[in-house]
Amino acid sequence: EVQQLVADQIIDFFKTNPNYTVASIGQNDGNGDPASEDYANWCECDDCKKFATDFTQAMMKFAKIIGQKIEKQCPGKSIMFYGYFPTFTAPDTTALKAEDNVVMMLCKEGGLTRFIRNGNLFNAAIGQPQFKDNYQAWKDLGYQIYEWNCPGAASDKWKDMFWIQGEVFLDNLKWLKQNGTQYLCMDQGPNPAYERADGYMDIRWPLWYVSAKGMWDCNLSFEDILMPACKRFKAV
């Protein structure tokens, strides 16, 4: 019943919004911690436990079912779920190949100073895999991969820190493009939970500027992007 309700809503959404090509059916930040405000994203009743062995496979199976249900009525449209926290690690199975109309938004966090191609551990302390290996494992399951990228830390300790993710960010963009990423979403505030409420442009414009220009052309160097902007500021 839930599956059909979601499919019906997705079909209605695309009919109402014909210019949209993707709709999310994914969870938010829920990380499986009972103390998390997002914990309710994951039902753990007996039926749901029978549905899948873990959160990742539950999301994959659910997305596959919804994708099949909307395919005929929504040609050329896709649905998306997140590879994030409990669903970050690709499962060790080939039984859950992706539908053509299912997209996975893989969320890279951590490793803000590291190159993906050199081995960028997401969180070794809790046993998560190398980002690049995990990325390839999702591709091997047939998923179109979008990328959610946070170039700065979601921490109030960073709110007054001048931070530019330069050559690392640009090289990581190249790696993602070379490995088939179709869409990149940049997420970096301003969020009053961990950023300045006012005056954030003074300290964040270089980070955002390099990110934006780099997405237009990731073959530019850090100096190519930022030096002309700094010279214009100096001239003013």
Regions found by a protein language model. Name each.
Residues E1-Q4, D8-M227, R232-K234:
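Catalytic-core regions of glycoside hydrolase
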